[in-house]
Curated annotation (Swiss-Prot):
Biased composition (Polar residues): 504-514, 526-540
Protein name (Swiss-Prot/TrEMBL): Calcium/calmodulin-dependent protein kinase type II
Lineage: Eukaryota, Metazoa, Ecdysozoa, Nematoda, Chromadorea
Consequence of substituting F97K: Increase in calcium independent kinase activity, no effect on translocation to the neurite
Alphabetized GO MF terms: ATP binding; calcium/calmodulin-dependent protein kinase activity; calmodulin binding; identical protein binding; metal ion binding; protein serine kinase activity; transmembrane transporter binding
Gene this protein is translated from: unc-43
Species per Swiss-Prot/TrEMBL record: Caenorhabditis elegans
Main location as per UniProt: cytoplasm
Length: 720
């Protein structure tokens, strides 16, 4: 798109927010000249590291190359001083999987049409040297709400550029959709996308994935072995041609795996009217509803964790925690979030800051409790402490669910029925008359948010109930309350969807219990029982590297952990153990990340970053020192000051981290250095390296390095 000005605000009018991430926000925008609507991804580049910024540039570069009817198109990319604007197609149809469950009719032939469009987009990407690497339901959208709208492939944040002579190393993708070669840390290329297509096609046909386990190690073992099957009765009605296509996509050996172009020529796809079954698959739709609900629940929980970590909305007015009327404890927000206490704003003193996941014990019919952080109400009593519990409750007699909101004095507010057509006497509990006006106002605001964040059908049904009850619904939530509560209300809505889909005893079962129930699918339940790893929605992008022929270039990568987790255990000892394990894992990840940053600085000849990450008295044993122990970093300045023009790419393979106490760590790894010599010839060099890190003044610095390899010559590159 050609614009007279390179300034975003000169070309576009910004409208409402469509979505939000840690460092970006997506807003609807209108082009001032044409009046066309787009979706603008606005990235705050001040918050990005150098590695993140290179990832952003790579994504924009790839998206500019791709113009296909089944790919969300990038129309404009504008870089300003503090923000980068990516202007995409405005895709209004929502997720493909959500649309399927709303259809009145869905057959194997429909699944064939869906996967055909996905394969068309992948074939186009591969023909242009692009590997997506993150194919999953969340990235499959519909162009509009119209019937028969095109499927659009989105999110090229993990995509890479390759050619037929290149292969990549690096752990990137989403666990449930990762290919065996990625998990085995073998070189990989375009076939990884076909494997993910096979997983998606399997889900499209029966509503659950081929590989599942609550334990991620066992999940990975299943994938590496290609251990999946076609259980009865749901697979009995699927044609052999569909199963054959899945088998060709889920072939463990990537060299024998079918390509996108070959898959498009399979009769089940190109002649679906003759080959694919046209029988309605109600069991698949029912199962897919539950699959979607679990995905949304995990995504919402991840959003809550992201809010508590990144947004800074958690504020506390009570550092010691408070005891609720039922005897349970609501912990201090800074303790729950793992952050320091923040001063409260005037608005935060009147309204609850954020809903926190709380594993308190509630009645058996409670699906999930979410409790607001305590706050003081200055208008009524400086000593009066209030907080709410927002939960879904399932009637034991009717199995119907509804939203229930109660405060710490056991007053009940707005038990709006959201998932059935009628409200039973059990569900029509009237609000207590003892609640204060401030409390009722907040209850109204929270209930408003729940209604607006629910699906349109739920919203209409709920608003009708409100109208019939002659309740006053003019109170709306203030902006700061909406910003803080929306992610958690999404969790509650997703939880309610699970309850309405008859996922029994979710509150009473631990994640492992649920996993065992799902694994015993054939014996215990109908084909609508879902199966999915608790980690399958977590996206990973770790230590990418390019290997092979062609021009070598320095590529930075970033570890992205969305942190989706299962249900929190109420056992203190279990929670402490999990917390300790999580902290240790996070520390190890930090060491790997800072080591990769140091290697990147060496490759880029960035002496400023190098000195920031190394202690001034760092010692080293390395071939360049001819066996001598060198102290200080000045010895290495020569390699930065030299006028080296070689293009260098460094990869850290198989890092092994040992945490030593609280302030020290050691990492050992194999370093692969790829470069072009002065004649343009490619070389690869391998060495074994270990680094000792020490935490000083809250940051990690390298205090010792030991490397084993042959000394550098004029045809190679120093690897210090």
């Amino acid at each position: 798109m050609m614009n007279a000005s390179t300034k975003f605000s000169d070309n576009y009018d910004v409208k409402e927010e469509l979505g939000k991430g840690a460092f970006s926000v997506v807003r609807r925008c209108v082009h001032k000249t044409t009046g066309l609507e787009f979706a603008a991804k606005i990235i705050n580049t001040k918050k990005l590291s150098a590695r993140d910024f290179q990832k952003l540039e790579r994504e924009a570069r790839i998206c500019r190359k791709l113009q296909h009817p089944n790919i969300v198109r990038l129309h404009d990319s504008i870089q300003e001083e503090s923000f980068h604007y990516l202007v995409f197609d405005l895709v209004t149809g929502g997720e493909l999987f959500e649309d399927i469950v709303a259809r009145e009719f869905y057959s194997e032939a429909d699944a064939s049409h869906c996967i055909q469009q996905i394969l068309e987009s992948i074939a186009y990407c591969h023909s242009n040297g692009i590997v997506h690497r993150d194919l999953k339901p969340e990235n499959l959208l519909l162009a509009s709400k119209a019937k028969g709208a095109a499927v659009k492939l989105a999110d090229f944040g993990l995509a890479i550029e390759v050619n037929d002579s290149e292969a990549w190393h690096g752990f990137a993708g989403t666990p449930g959709y990762l290919s065996p070669e990625v998990l085995k840390k073998d070189p990989y290329s375009k076939p990884v996308d076909i494997w993910a297509c096979g997983v998606i096609l399997y889900i499209l046909l029966v509503g659950y994935p081929p590989f599942w386990d609550e334990d991620q190690h066992r999940l990975y073992a299943q994938i590496k072995a290609g251990a999946y099957d076609y259980p009865s009765p749901e697979w009995d009605t699927v044609t052999p041609e569909a199963k054959s296509l899945i088998d060709s996509m889920l072939t463990v050996n990537p060299k024998k795996r079918i390509t996108a172009d070959q898959a498009l020529k399979v009769p089940w796809i190109c002649n679906r009217e003759r080959v694919a079954s046209a029988i309605h698959r109600q069991d698949t739709v029912d199962c897919l509803k539950k699959f979607n609900a679990r995905r949304k629940l995990k995504a919402a929980i991840s959003a809550v964790k992201m809010v508590t970590r990144m947004s800074g909305v958690l504020r506390t007015s009570d550092s010691t925690g408070s005891v609720a009327s039922n005897g349970s404890t609501t912990h201090d927000a800074s303790q729950v979030a793992g952050t320091s206490s923040q001063p409260t704003s005037p608005a935060a003193e009147v309204y609850p800051n954020v809903l926190l996941f709380n594993p308190q014990k509630f009645p058996r019919n409670c699906v999930h409790p979410f409790t607001t952080h305590p706050y003081y109400s200055p208008k009524e009593s400086s000593k009066k402490k209030l907080f709410f519990t927002l939960l879904f409750e399932v009637c034991p007699h009717t199995s119907r669910s509804h939203i229930l909101l109660r405060d710490n004095t056991k007053n009940i507010y707005h038990p709006y029925h959201c998932f059935t057509n009628k409200m039973s006497n059990y569900e029509r509990a009237a609000p207590s008359s003892h609640g204060s006006s401030t409390t009722k106002k907040i209850a109204n605001a929270i209930a408003d948010l729940v209604i607006r964040r629910s699906s349109p059908s739920i919203r209409r049904k709920t608003e009708a109930d409100v109208h019939n009850s002659n309740r006053n619904r003019k109170v709306s939530a203030p902006a700061n309350l909406q910003h803080a509560l929306v992610p958690v209300i999404d969790v509650v809505v997703a939880t309610g969807a699970l309850a309405s889909s008859s996922v029994d005893n979710l509150s009473a079962s631990t994640s492992s219990d649920l996993g065992r129930n799902l694994l015993n699918k054939k014996e215990q339940g109908p084909p609508s029982t879902i199966k999915e790893s608790s980690e399958s929605s977590q996206t990973i992008d770790d230590n990418d590297s390019e290997k092979g022929g062609g021009q070598l270039k320095h590529e930075n990568t970033v570890v992205r952990a969305d942190g989706a987790t299962g249900i929190v255990s109420s056992s203190n000892s279990s929670t402490a153990s999990k917390s300790s394990s999580t902290n240790l894992s996070a520390q190890k990840q930090d060491i790997v990340r800072v080591t990769q940053t140091l290697l990147d600085a060496i490759s880029c000849k960035d002496f400023e970053t190098y000195t920031r990450l190394c202690d001034t008295s760092m010692t080293c044993f390395e071939p360049e020192a001819l066996g001598n122990l060198i102290e200080g970093i000045e010895f290495h300045r020569f390699y930065f000051d030299g006028n080296r023009k070689n293009q260098v790419h460094t990869t850290m393979l198989n890092p092994n981290v040992h945490i030593i106490g609280e302030d020290a760590a050691c990492v050992a790894y194999v370093k692969l250095t790829q470069f072009l010599d002065r004649n343009g010839e490619a070389h690869t060099r391998q060495s074994q390296e270990s680094r000792v890190w020490s935490k000083k003044q809250g940051r990690w610095v390298c205090v010792h390095v030991h490397r084993s390899t042959q000394p550098s010559t004029n045809t190679t590159v120093s690897e210090f």
